[in-house]
């Protein structure tokens, strides 16, 4: 048991994680920082037995009051120490936990293993003003485990004055990060992200500059708060305007700017419409400095409107279907207010990932120099493809616990059917051509075809049009990708005017009454896969026959919620009124047999062509990759003068990677089936 000493001593240690509290009075978000409750289990599920998380006990960014006779645990997402990640990805043998307190009480220090088994490893009695230090070895965490501490107040309040985890080991990299924020007409959100970063105490030790790439017509610089931020940041704020080139264009510009800053070792990509935890930014940079070799360090995403709920703890690309997804669907949208760190056993196992979303992603500039910038695809799959490309070059991606942002959830979106459907279809196929290890892409082509046919059964002819355009552009090869960066979005949006179903009826008084009263829809779980197929085979053929005029007139047959509107439900009707995913209105879909037949023939032909030409296309895309992601190509696209600098991908790597890619594509017949 360490002795509590009255005064802190000077240290040359490097702080890698501070214990912090939320800056806003939001009780919901407090569960991500502390756990003051007692828990039990009912039927194997965690149940909170108390409600001791008091937002009014937060006294400052690093100060917390523990009421007399009560206890608080820092076994939380933001304040537990992810020991498993530090052991796996760095060479640090131990960290020191330093806790500064005032008042009487007890400190208990815990660790867990990969199975979530908790062990108390140390404790200290404190009184008055005290500083307690605990040496915590980073051993026996290879598969998982965390460190944390609890505070128990004595007969009077115990106040945490501050705490941190540090190391005396020198980092492998000492440079800072240049932030790259891409924004398009979210000026109010964007200026708030800059404000949160600018006002965090100590963040200047981690950040070299903040680059805002403004691609919209509603300028960030016109926001009332912008002049004061510009004055505070001075030369550290780099505000740029350019045409709308999507996320990949904006983030590539951020990479280009970071490469020109001698003090930067990293570029930190951030979305413009997030709430950022600045301490997480500092932790990501600290972790990135200590990794064995350059590593992409990603932050997790929480729901902006359900603050304790995480989107996904770890994500992968299913190489056979070539589709992104959580590594484990049972861990999807986990709510820490319902089950915190100590109650959630799977959170203790280290989770390795294939990629991390670019809502928050720290990329070493060594990686950028070697593998290039973003794929020129506007939006969708640029982040996943980049990590897959990095992996091909020996660079890993880590989704790092304790580094996170809050972002609007995908739950209120359905971008697979709106204008973004084009980018989903095209960019997924391009990423698969670049990285699939399977002969003719494995199951990817079949899965893409199935998705297209489902949209036809759902009478989503606009979506199918975009899918078709996307596949056609894939078949055209990689040479036109940069040329389309500034124009394809306009083409896609212009297509919508030809399709009446794209009109959202937002006035409830204007909603037509359905002719059929539907009380329920046949559920997937009741049918099973075999029953679902039978249902589709029964109802599908009607789409080849001309619909009755009465069924496709002003009144739809049925009115369905967004969750009811599955393909097997809509396959049985000639028309339907369907709610949008965000609940803002409804869209009127009508069946057209002639369109269905024409579109079905086209999508079958396109996917046959994709399968037939897969080996050739894979070789073309892989051979072109170094060029289309190079600094020269991107400087030309964003309108910057050429510098005559060396290629982004080193010649040795580029030649080897390109020849290897072409060879692997041409030998696909002998690879996995």
Question: How would you describe each model-predicted region?
Answer:
Residues 186-201:
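Short, well-formed alpha-helical segments that are part of the catalytic scaffolds
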Residues 197-240:
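Acidic donor-binding segment of Leloir-type glycosyltransferases
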Residues 356-360, 365, 369-388, 394-400, ...:
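Donor nucleotide-sugar recognition loop
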Residues 176-178, 209, 385:
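Cell-envelope/extracellular polymer assembly enzymes that use nucleotide-activated donors
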Residues 275-328:
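Conserved donor NDP-sugar-binding/catalytic core segment of glycosyltransferases
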Residues 2-151, 426-673:
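Terminal low-complexity segments of carbohydrate-biosynthetic enzymes
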Residues 262-275:
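Short beta-strand-to-loop acidic/aromatic patch adjacent to the donor-nucleotide binding site
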Residues 328-360, 414:
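A recurrent flexible, glycine/aromatic-enriched loop bordering the glycosyltransferase active site
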């Amino acid at each position: 048991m360490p002795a509590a000493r009255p005064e802190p001593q000077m240290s040359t240690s490097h702080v890698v994680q501070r214990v912090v509290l939320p800056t806003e009075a939001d009780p919901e978000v407090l569960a991500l920082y502390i756990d003051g409750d007692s828990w039990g289990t009912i039927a194997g599920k965690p149940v909170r037995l108390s409600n001791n998380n008091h937002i009014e006990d937060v006294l400052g960014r690093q100060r917390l009051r523990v009421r007399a006779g009560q206890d608080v645990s820092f076994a939380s997402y933001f304040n537990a120490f992810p020991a498993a990640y530090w052991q796996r990805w760095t060479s640090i043998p131990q960290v020191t936990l330093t806790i500064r307190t005032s008042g009487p009480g007890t400190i208990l220090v815990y660790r867990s293993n990969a199975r979530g088994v908790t062990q108390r490893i140390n404790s200290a009695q404190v009184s008055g003003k005290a500083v307690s230090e605990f040496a915590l070895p980073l051993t026996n965490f290879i598969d998982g485990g965390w460190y944390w501490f609890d505070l128990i107040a004595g007969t009077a309040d115990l106040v945490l004055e501050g705490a941190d985890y540090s190391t005396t080991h020198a980092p492998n990299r000492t440079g800072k990060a240049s932030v790259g924020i891409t924004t398009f007409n979210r000026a109010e959100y964007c200026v708030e992200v800059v404000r949160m970063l600018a006002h965090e105490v100590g963040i200047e030790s981690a950040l070299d500059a903040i680059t805002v790439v403004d691609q919209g017509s509603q300028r960030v610089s016109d926001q009332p708060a912008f002049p004061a931020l510009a004055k505070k940041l001075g030369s550290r704020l780099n505000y740029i305007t350019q045409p709308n080139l999507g996320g990949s264009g904006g983030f590539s510009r951020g990479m280009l700017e970071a490469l020109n800053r001698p003090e930067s070792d990293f570029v930190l990509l951030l979305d413009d419409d997030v709430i950022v935890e600045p301490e997480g930014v500092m932790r990501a940079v600290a972790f990135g400095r200590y990794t064995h070799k350059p590593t992409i360090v990603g932050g997790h995403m929480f729901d902006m409107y359900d603050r304790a709920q995480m989107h996904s703890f770890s994500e992968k690309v299913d190489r056979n279907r070539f589709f992104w997804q959580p590594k484990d669907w049972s861990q999807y949208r986990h709510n820490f207010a319902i089950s915190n760190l100590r109650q959630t056993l799977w959170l203790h196992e280290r989770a390795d990932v294939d990629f991390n979303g670019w809502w928050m992603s720290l990329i070493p500039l060594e990686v950028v120099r070697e593998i290039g910038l973003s794929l020129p695809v506007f939006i969708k799959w640029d982040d996943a493809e980049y990590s897959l490309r990095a992996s091909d070059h020996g660079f890993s991606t880590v989704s790092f616990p304790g580094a996170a942002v809050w972002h609007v959830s995908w739950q209120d979106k359905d971008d697979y059917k709106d204008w973004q459907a084009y980018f989903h279809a095209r960019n997924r196929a391009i990423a698969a051509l670049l990285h699939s290890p399977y002969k003719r892409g494995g199951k990817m082509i079949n899965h893409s075809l199935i998705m297209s046919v489902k949209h036809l059964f759902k009478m989503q002819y606009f979506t199918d049009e975009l899918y078709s355009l996307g596949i056609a552009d894939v078949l055209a090869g990689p040479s036109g990708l940069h040329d389309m960066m500034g124009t394809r979005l306009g083409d896609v949006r212009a297509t919508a005017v030809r399709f009446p179903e794209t009109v959202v009826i937002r006035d409830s008084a204007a909603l037509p009454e359905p002719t059929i009263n539907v009380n329920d829809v046949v559920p997937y779980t009741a049918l099973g896969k075999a029953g679902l197929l039978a249902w589709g085979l029964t109802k599908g053929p009607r789409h080849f026959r001309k619909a009755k005029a009465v069924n496709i007139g002003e009144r739809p047959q049925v009115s369905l919620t967004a969750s009811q509107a599955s393909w097997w439900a809509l396959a049985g009707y000639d028309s339907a009124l369907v709610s949008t995913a965000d609940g803002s209105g409804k869209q009127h879909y009508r069946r057209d047999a002639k369109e269905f037949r024409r579109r079905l023939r086209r999508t079958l032909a396109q996917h046959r062509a994709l399968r037939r030409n897969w080996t050739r296309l894979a070789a073309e895309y892989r051979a072109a990759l170094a060029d289309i992601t190079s600094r020269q190509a991107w400087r030309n696209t964003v309108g910057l003068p050429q510098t005559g600098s060396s290629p982004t991908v080193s010649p040795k790597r580029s030649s080897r990677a390109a020849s290897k890619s072409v060879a692997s594509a041409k030998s696909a017949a002998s690879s996995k089936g």
